[in-house]
Regions:
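Acidic, metal-coordinating catalytic segment for phosphate/diphosphate chemistry
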Residues: 1-16, 20
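Short, P/G- and charge-enriched loop/turn segments at secondary-structure junctions
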Residues: 1-7, 94-107, 166-169
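Conserved beta-strand and immediately adjacent loop positions that scaffold enzyme active sites
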Residues: 16, 26, 179
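Active-site beta-strand termini and strand-to-loop segments that position acidic
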Residues: 19-23, 32, 119-121
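A conserved hydrophobic position in a structured secondary element of the catalytic/binding core
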Residues: 20, 43, 183
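Conserved Nudix-box catalytic region and its N-terminal flanking loop in Nudix hydrolases
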Residues: 23-87
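Nudix hydrolase/Nudix homology domain
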Residues: 36-40, 110, 114-116, 120-216
Length: 216
């Protein structure tokens, strides 16, 4: 733990997501060439827009960088946030961040604070509702329904369904070079680097998805 203070002009807040396709037990990772032309892998992330909710910002960045629409997935993760009043006996499922990462931004005193969330790809019906033209303003999806179990969620897709991938969702020249891949959890961890925070986000997300299945 640390104590630190940053003024508004030196602080940038962002969010990232591990986007799971639950039915096929796969997760979305992105890739891009580094300065040496070699491919590296990462989870989609970025700064939230001014006035934007942090969770919505994470979903939007996930969509823009990967091309996969997504929504945060409520899971039985451990966290330190208090429950809303009146409190219930059993802790509810929440979509709280599973990791917080702090990084210097450029040179000087600027600080980047990044929250990592767990999300899922959208069912076919929502993809139709949210369809927009390339370059149009981002349209956020509705939240995951409280009463929808994961098993019933999986049944919303026909067997062998492939989540819809959207082209041209990047908002600048750099993001236009990004490629996305829907891979197994093990392959994602290997490509992200087993000791890095992004691999741990994937691991924790998949563990809690399995935990929720067991609870239901």
């Amino acid at each position: 733990p640390l104590i630190a203070q940053f003024s508004d002009e030196d602080l940038v807040v962002g969010g990232g997501v591990a986007i799971f396709h639950i039915a096929s037990q796969r997760v979305v990772i992105c890739s891009a060439p580094d300065r040496r032309g070699e491919k590296y892998y990462f989870l989609p992330k970025g700064r939230r827009d001014a006035g934007e909710d942090s969770r919505t910002g994470a979903e939007r960045e996930g969509y823009e960088e990967s091309g996969y629409r997504n929504r945060l997935l409520p899971l039985p993760t451990k966290h330190r946030q208090p429950q809303a009043h009146p409190r219930v006996d059993s802790p509810p499922l929440t979509a709280e961040p599973v990791w917080m990462q702090m990084m210097p931004l450029g040179y000087g005193s600027k600080q980047y604070v990044l929250y990592w969330y767990i999300a899922e790809t959208l069912p076919p019906g929502l993809e139709v509702e949210l369809e927009t033209e390339v370059g149009a303003a981002y349209k956020p999806p509705p939240a995951y329904p409280h009463s929808l179990t994961l098993r019933d969620r999986v049944k919303m897709e026909p067997e062998g369904y492939e989540p819809l991938h959207h082209e041209g969702t990047g908002v600048d020249e750099e993001e236009a070079t990004y490629e996305s891949h829907l891979v197994s959890v093990e392959e994602a961890i290997k490509k992200l680097g087993r000791t890095g925070v992004m691999a741990d986000v994937v691991l924790k997300g998949w563990k809690e998805i399995q935990h929720r299945f067991a609870m239901e």
